[in-house]
Design a protein with these regions (language model features):
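Active-site-adjacent substructure of cysteine-protease-like catalytic cores
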Residues: 97-149
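N-terminal export leaders
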Residues: 9-12
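Active-site-adjacent structural segments surrounding the nucleophilic cysteine of cysteine proteases
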Residues: 2-6, 18-80, 84, 105, ...
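Noncatalytic regulatory segments and standalone regulatory/sensor domains
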Residues: 26, 79, 113, 117, ...
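Short, conserved catalytic or adaptor-binding loops enriched in Gly and charged residues
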Residues: 23, 89-92, 167-169
Length: 188
């Protein structure tokens, strides 16, 4: 009986010493995950970034950062989603400064190192005009990985850099940075 207990104890300590796979290596931010509704990836991505900044400032998420509200405010039937320019406009109206640009790996690294998640547009299907917005929440340069909060799937979805780059390049590497405007009363 004593030997059985010792084997279990050794096994337990052995398991506890294994590296934890819950957190990806490299740089990553704990951006809240918001699941999208139909054609709601843009709204969910805006909500994730707004909620991230509200949490950073110790505030509770408010109605403006609710994905359903963003979707109601911005959804365009013709686009079957939200236009990129409207994402930035909504964030501006709610206390953020926004910067849309053609991103590169160095931009992902720089902004994540400074605690700033990015919204990017991807084009998963080259034969479709549909875009898909995700939030870049982490990278691992050593393993050439990008981690995104994909509102259609899950938090910290792993992409090989080459696959991510192909889908991102199809949108001309569209990237949106949103940072709280200092002193804005409606800023999170």
């Amino acid at each position: 009986m004593g030997g059985d207990f010792q084997r279990r104890l050794v096994l337990l300590f052995g398991l506890l010493s294994l590296p934890c796979a819950a957190e990806p290596p490299g740089i990553w931010l704990d951006v809240p995950f918001v699941k999208q509704e139909r054609n709601g990836c843009g709204a969910a991505s805006v909500a994730m970034v707004m909620q991230y900044w509200q949490r950073q400032r110790g505030k509770v998420a408010d109605a403006s950062s609710d994905a359903r509200q963003v979707q109601r405010a911005l959804y365009a039937k013709k686009a079957h989603g939200i236009y990129a320019s409207d994402l930035g406009r909504y964030l501006e109206q709610h206390g953020f400064r926004t910067f849309a640009f053609h991103g590169e790996w160095s931009d992902l690294s720089q902004h994540l190192e400074n605690g700033r998640p990015l919204i990017v547009a991807l084009k998963p299907d080259a034969n479709s005009v549909a875009l898909h917005y995700v939030v870049v929440a982490g990278i691992d340069a050593k393993r050439s990985l990008v981690f995104v909060n994909d509102p259609a799937e899950r938090k910290l979805r792993e992409h090989e850099w080459s696959d991510f780059r192909r889908e991102w390049n199809a949108t001309d590497d569209w990237t949106l940075l949103a940072v709280p405007r200092e002193g804005a009363s409606s800023a999170p």
